[in-house]
Amino acid sequence: MNTKLVVVFLLSAILFVSVTASRPGKDLERDEAYETYDDENKRACKDVFPAATCRHAKSVGNCSSEKYKRNCAITCGAC
């Protein structure tokens, strides 16, 4: 075999192994980012509609409606 081809193959193999070996640490960082994203979503949870509208929707049982789930999230207990 050509010597240059062998050298290129070995360097490629070494690079592949080093990149693959460093990935588990990256996955942990990505998981932490997802947890932070979930926390931010919980903090951003709010009622968009006026409080009286949300209270009325809850009292008549409309919280199962997608409209009220999204716009009265705190009152309807979506978050």
UniProtKB/Swiss-Prot annotation:
Coiled coil: none annotated. Two similar peptides (OspTx2a-p1 and -p2) are obtained after synthesis and oxidative folding. They may differ by a D-Cys at position 76 (corresponding to OspTx2a-p2). Since C-terminal Cys residues are prone to racemization during solid-phase peptide synthesis, and if the presence of a D-amino acid is correct, it is probable that OspTx2a-p1 (L-Cys-76 form) corresponds to the native peptide. Disulfide bonds join C45-C79, C54-C72, C63-C76. The keyword Secreted applies. SUPFAM superfamilies: Crisp domain-like (SSF57546). The 49-Phe-Pro-50 bond exists only in the trans-isomerization. Negative results: has no effect on rKv1.1/KCNA1, hKv1.3/KCNA3, rKv1.4/KCNA4, rKv1.5/KCNA5, hKv2.1/KCNB1, rKv3.1/KCNC1, rKv4.2/KCND2, hKv10.1/EAG1/KCNH1, Kv11.1/HERG/KCNH2, and Shaker IR (tested at 10 uM). Its main location: secreted. Residues 22-43 form a propeptide. This is U-actitoxin-Oulsp1. Residues 1-21 form the signal peptide. It is found in: Secreted. GO terms for molecular function: potassium channel regulator activity; toxin activity. Residues 67-68 are annotated as: Crucial for binding to potassium channels. GO terms for cellular component: extracellular region; nematocyst. Keywords: Cleavage on pair of basic residues, Disulfide bond, Ion channel impairing toxin, Neurotoxin, Potassium channel impairing toxin, Secreted, Signal, Toxin, Voltage-gated potassium channel impairing toxin. Residues 45-79 form the ShKT domain. Toxin that weakly blocks the two voltage-gated potassium channels on Kv1.2/KCNA2 (IC(50)=1.8-2.5 uM) and Kv1.6/KCNA6 (IC(50)=5.6-6.2 uM). Belongs to the sea anemone type 1 potassium channel toxin family. Type 1b subfamily.
